[in-house]
UniProtKB/Swiss-Prot annotation:
Outcome of mutating residue 415 to V: Complete loss of activity
Protein's name in the database: MIO-dependent tyrosine 2,3-aminomutase
InterPro entries the record matches: Aromatic_Lyase (IPR001106), Fumarase/histidase_N (IPR024083), L-Aspartase-like (IPR008948), Phe/His_NH3-lyase_AS (IPR022313), Tyr_aminomutase (IPR022314)
Family: Belongs to the TAL/TAM family.
Assembly and interaction partners: Homotetramer; dimer of dimers.
Described function: Catalyzes the MIO-dependent deamination of L-tyrosine generating the corresponding alpha,beta-unsaturated acid, (S)-beta-tyrosine.
């Protein structure tokens, strides 16, 4: 099934604690789809609350309910202080700094937290679920600073900024800017909530920051991999490359990694109908015909194989895909997990544990960062392949259409692509950066939200690298005069570029061209072009 559809019907997303997907989170975040908390989930939450309250009334010690928090667990707190204890927790941990998450990112975080609480083991009252759902459905979006999470005990600081809005404090976004929550709630006639036993803790003690953001990053990264395949196919056609490296038997039978199979299938589909590509058998026959009798060694201008950057696409992009598939799987598990502490199960002892620890997501998002970094490397090397006259199979230096020397063509446009590859490589794994905190109570932490933010940064950088490649591939088509021989998919891709940016005839200001195409990539425009203009269903 294609990852991106031309049109998506806006139907409510069921938030039941069991079935939420990365794709559904994107719908809530990006398309502003509404959410529905099923009656069964409300009933589970109510049952969990009743179990909890029965325990609490017996004065049984419960972390964060009759005790202080974190390292201060040794402090016993009377249950008469329940509201004050929960409110103080939220206020004190609303200490995030730095830029605010974008509105779609904040919506993803809220959706992730709502689904975790809807699983029914966190002992919050149903009104908490209903209020978070109301926020998503009415477009009330908490203003959440990006910096402050250690990824264990979950994303405390970011989620505190969500919880603070429920009690009428902190800020929400209006037109992308923070305004006081109290003002917005008053305008809408919404009464702030009073947090009861455990509810402050349940709201903030979990992985929903890294998981919500990670869902957006991984979903978009899968689309970026597809768009990398699209431009690679166009570029291969422009330089009259071979389709043989993508034959099914070399992947489905010989080396059946799922991502490799999917990428090879996409490459075959994208170049189907091309009058420019060649096959290995044709090259072999031509080489045999060219060989002079009686010579043991002779030079030929016929290359049976092109460089790795034009041949190892299934192996490289396919491995990126496999990494993203793994991350998507881990995110789906985490989205549908109870990841606060403590947890309550009927007929069982209170579970005091550490499900808030973000290590699974931290590792997964670091893997994503590594994979996307290599995707950027591949794109930059493909750019170089058509800009370097010694490697470009007859194309002029830097794709200059006029007088080389007087004009520089794409020489300058290559620099940001190369610089961004280097920048991506400086972004090391955050999951190995544990720093003890909280009086050494939190002595091993995941830094998972940093991992997710790092992956987001590389994703954004790659859109700019790929933008240069799209521009260069279209320019190669123009200079070579090979448009008529392109496959239907390549023509659709070329025309999508040219709707944004004209051919580079003489040198001009290039930054705007790159940003226009990068923005189109971020919106999935080239996926839509393929879906609209061809019958190809990309994997």
């Amino acid at each position: 099934m294609a990852l991106t559809q031309v049109e998506t019907e806006i139907v409510p997303v069921s938030v039941d604690g069991e079935t939420l997907t990365v794709e559904a989170v994107r719908r809530v975040a990006e398309e502003r789809a509404t959410v529905d908390v099923p009656a069964e989930s409300i009933a589970k939450a109510q049952k969990s609350r009743e179990i909890f309250e029965g325990i609490a009334e017996q004065n049984i010690p419960i972390y964060g309910v009759t005790t202080g928090y974190g390292e201060m667990i040794y402090m016993q707190v009377d249950k008469s202080k329940e509201v004050e204890l929960q409110t103080n927790l939220v206020r004190s941990h609303s200490a995030g700094v730095g830029p605010l998450f974008a509105e779609d990112e904040a919506r993803a975080i809220v959706a992730a937290r709502l689904n975790t609480l809807a699983k029914g083991h966190s002992a919050v009252r149903p009104i908490i679920l209903e209020r978070l759902a109301q926020y998503l459905n009415e477009g009330i979006t908490p203003a959440i600073p990006e910096i402050g999470s250690l990824g264990a005990s979950g994303d405390l600081a970011p989620l505190s900024h969500v919880a603070s809005t429920l009690i009428g404090e902190g800020y929400v976004l209006r037109d992308g800017r923070p305004v006081e929550t109290a003002q917005v709630l008053a305008e809408r006639g919404i009464e702030p909530l009073e947090l009861r036993f455990k509810e402050g803790l349940a709201l903030i003690n979990g992985t929903s920051g890294m998981t919500g953001l990670g869902s957006l990053v991984v979903g978009r990264a899968l689309e970026q991999a597809q768009q990398a395949e699209i431009v690679t196919a166009l570029l291969i056609e422009a330089v009259r490359g071979s389709t043989s490296p993508f034959l099914a038997e070399g992947h489905d039978i010989a080396r059946p990694h799922e991502g490799q199979i999917d990428t090879a299938a996409n490459m075959r589909a994208l170049m189907r109908g091309s009058g420019l590509t060649v096959e290995h058998a044709d090259l072999r026959r031509e080489l045999q015909k060219d060989k002079e009798a009686g010579k043991d060694v002779q030079r030929s201008e016929i290359y049976l194989q092109k460089a790795y950057s034009l041949r190892a696409i299934p192996q490289v992009v396919g491995a990126v895909r496999d990494t993203l598939y793994h991350a998507r799987h881990k995110l789906r598990i985490e989205l549908n997990s109870a990841n606060d502490n403590p947890l309550f199960f009927e007929g069982k002892e209170i579970f005091h544990g550490a499900n808030f620890h973000g290590q699974p997501i931290a590792f997964a998002m670091d893997f994503v960062t590594i994979a996307l970094t290599q995707l950027g490397v591949l794109a930059e090397r493909q750019i170089n392949r058509v800009l370097n006259r010694h490697l470009s199979y007859g194309l002029p230096e830097f794709l200059v259409s006029g007088d080389p020397g007087l004009h520089s063509g794409f020489a300058g446009a290559q620099y940001p692509a190369t610089a961004l590859v280097a920048e991506n490589r400086t972004i090391g794994p955050a999951s190995t950066q544990s720093v003890p905190s909280n009086g050494d109570n939190q002595d091993v932490v995941s830094m998972g939200l940093i991992s997710a933010r790092n992956a987001r940064r590389v994703l954004s950088n790659n859109n700019k690298i790929l933008a240069v490649e799209y521009l260069a591939a279209a320019q190669a088509v123009d200079i070579s005069g090979r448009f008529d021989g392109l496959s239907p998919a390549a023509k659709a891709t070329y025309e999508a570029v040219r709707r944004l940016v004209p051919t580079l005839g003489v040198d001009r200001y290039m930054a705007d061209d790159i940003e226009l195409v990068a923005d189109a990539l971020s919106r999935g425009e080239f996926l839509r072009a393929i879906a609209r203009e061809t019958d190809i269903q990309l994997r």
